[in-house]
Amino acid sequence: MQVSVETTQGLGRRVTITIAADSIETAVKSELVNVAKKVRIDGFRKGKVPMNIVAQRYGASVRQDVLGDLMSRNFVDAIIKEKINPAGAPNYVPGEYKVGEDFTYSVEFEVYPEVELTGLESIEVEKPVVEVTDADVDVMLDTLRKQQATWKEKDGAADAEDRVTIDFTGSVDGEEFEGGKATDFVLAMGQGRMIPGFEDGVKGHKAGEEFTIDVTFPEEYHAENLKGKAAKFVINLKKVEERELPELTEEFIKRFGVEDGSVAGLRAEVRKNMERELKGAVRNRVKSQAIEGLVKANDIDVPSALIDSEIDVLRRQAAQRFGGNEKQALELPRELFEEQAKRRVVVGLLLGEVIRTNELKADEERVKGLIEEMASAYEDPKEVIEFYSKNKELMDNMRNVALEEQAVEAVLAKAKVSEKATSFNELMNQQA
């Protein structure tokens, strides 16, 4: 076997391989012997068919199969010998083949980039220092009460946290537009569902009033014909409702799994959940900064084959989220996922190099801790932990999470890490 390697462009490689004629003939004869042992031909007992007849009947297909097998095996031998690490599936380009002659073919593929990590000492990470205060717990309790609130009709004017029922008709330059009209539309104020200025125009009005408001569609509005356009909405306000928050009664508190039904018990449970969320948020915030710094400090080429593979993964995930199938996933435009896919590949390659150079292996104690932390959010943590322990795929996924955390910590060990006092609300809003 003769082998030559050339760089086509960037990470592209072409390996040209020549297989000696005698190697091909030896392999063909060997395979024909195997065929002769199995084949049945009228007039001959199984295994007793003359080789010339076997060769005449099956020689062409056997030779084709042998060539395909030799091409694959010799390519593997070649990349091992040349210490090449292909990324993605190789493209075989067969040359002209004549029986009795050497056979030359080429294989085109991309290789993984050679990554040499630099600039870790220049990475700057700001670690949030946060504690859950009594005031934070008060806000969360208020949020829980709002989620369980009922609505009661009121006579007064609509304000920022009310719910209104309206009819409206929108127009641009005196002409109604598609999607600009609704009847008995229920709008919970303060959630930002409508275009800027709409809710402000409703505030201060009472049920039974009809009025007109002026608004401007944002430049980034999804409908091309309405972007940046001034519009008028004629609104008939039919009903105004205000929230009635439930009292912190024993019955209400027990809905959240607090068995003793006490306010103190609820506050303790809420604080515990907030602290768990906080721990994850701090970890994610630090991790995202470390990875961002790692990416900025290390500009690497990325094999297009890996990007293509990641795009397929993202397409399928998107289709699953919206109830689509395999065919619909493949029809989603490549451009929607290309940037995210490239980013994920880059991060994977860089963290992989961190893991390799630091000789990291998943810490089983960390894996156990991650599973316990995740399970604590469920009603029966022991059941969740047992489920994970019996599922190899889930355990492997959690080991990957742990290994990634360890890689990030290795980056942080060399980075410039400072601390910044932050409120719970500020940090959680950054995560949103």
Swiss-Prot record:
It is an enzyme of class 5 (isomerase). Pfam families: FKBP_C, Trigger_C, Trigger_N. Keywords: Cell cycle, Cell division, Chaperone, Cytoplasm, Isomerase, Rotamase. One of its GO terms (cellular component) is cytoplasm. GO terms for molecular function: peptidyl-prolyl cis-trans isomerase activity; protein folding chaperone; ribosome binding. The keyword Isomerase applies. Its EC number is 5.2.1.8. InterPro entries: PPIase_dom_sf, PPIase_FKBP_dom, Trig_fac, Trigger_fac_C, Trigger_fac_C_sf, Trigger_fac_ribosome-bd_bac, Trigger_fac_ribosome-bd_sf, Trigger_fact/SurA_dom_sf. It comes from the Bacteria. HAMAP family: Trigger_factor_Tig (MF_00303). This is Trigger factor. It comes from Salmonella typhimurium (strain LT2 / SGSC1412 / ATCC 700720). The lineage of its organism: Bacteria, Pseudomonadati, Pseudomonadota, Gammaproteobacteria, Enterobacterales.
